[in-house]
Curated annotation (Swiss-Prot):
Top-tier EC class: transferase
Top-level division of the source organism's lineage: Bacteria
Self-association state and partner proteins as the record states: Heteromultimer composed of HisG and HisZ subunits.
Cellular-component GO terms for this entry: cytoplasm
Protein's name in the database: ATP phosphoribosyltransferase
Pathway(s) of this molecule: Amino-acid biosynthesis; L-histidine biosynthesis; L-histidine from 5-phospho-alpha-D-ribose 1-diphosphate: step 1/9
């Protein structure tokens, strides 16, 4: 049996992942045409490269169809309930940094904290008859965060792209989204609440707790020796 490792199929995440493994003596490369999403691993026997979208990798790890996967820590926490029971964090990779934050219109001069947001949400509902809308694609993470911080009288509305524009377009009053520099937020006249860092994300190498490791432990031992990573006892 081979050890299957899922890697983002395109863009900077794929390039940075290839670089990270390559610096440790494990060469990953695409094979065939660019859109075939097939690849190979050189330097370690018995390792199969599976190219997937970053959003698919948590699901494949949770289902046990791949043994290892590189994806954002935000995506694993969002897509897998009780994520730590389904996967183990093997190594932070030091790239793909971004923060999941909550932002409101910059002209809300009296709203700077989560307590302020809670008060504004209550006032909004009293004035308009419906809950304040927060646009996001991170429903699980944002809901858990707001609940833990006592924010009520809001509703999450789904946004799978251009979330920063939802306030300007009138489909939401606030947003919860990933940002690296904050430039896009400022361009859309939004400000980050001072205490609303939901999650600080980066690319992480994860191991599946649901995969069959009985015959993959050998290839992982060879791979782990290159990477300086032991196989967690819970996975054997």
């Amino acid at each position: 049996m081979t050890l299957k490792i899922g890697v983002p199929s395109k863009g900077r995440l794929m390039e940075k992942t290839f670089d990270w493994f390559g610096a440790r003596g494990v060469t990953m490369r695409q094979t065939g045409a660019e859109r075939e999403y097939s690849g190979a691993v050189d330097g370690v026997d018995g390792v199969e490269l599976v190219l997937l979208s970053a959003g698919e990798i948590p699901r494949e790890l949770g289902a046990g169809r791949i043994h290892l996967g590189v994806t954002g820590s935000d995506l694993v926490r969002e897509k897998l309930a009780d994520w730590s029971l389904q996967v183990a964090e093997m190594a932070p990779l030091g790239f793909g940094h971004a923060d999941l934050i909550i932002a409101v219109p910059a002209f809300w001069i009296d709203v700077d904290t989560l307590d302020d947001l809670d008060a504004a949400a209550a006032a909004f509902r009293a004035a308009h008859g419906f809950r304040l809308r927060i646009a996001t694609k991170y429903h699980r993470l944002v809901r858990e965060f707001l609940m833990a911080n006592g924010v009520a009288d809001y509703q999450l509305v789904d946004s799978q792209g251009a979330t920063e524009g939802t306030v300007k377009n009138g489909t939401a009053e606030a947003i919860a989204d990933i940002t690296s520099s904050g430039e896009t937020l400022r361009a859309n006249h939004l400000k980050i609440l001072s205490d609303a860092l939901v999650h600080s994300s980066q690319a992480v190498l994860f191991a599946s707790r649901r995969a069959d490791w009985s015959e993959a432990a050998g290839p992982f031992a060879a791979l782990g020796a290159r990477l300086g990573l032991p196989l967690p006892e819970a996975l054997t």
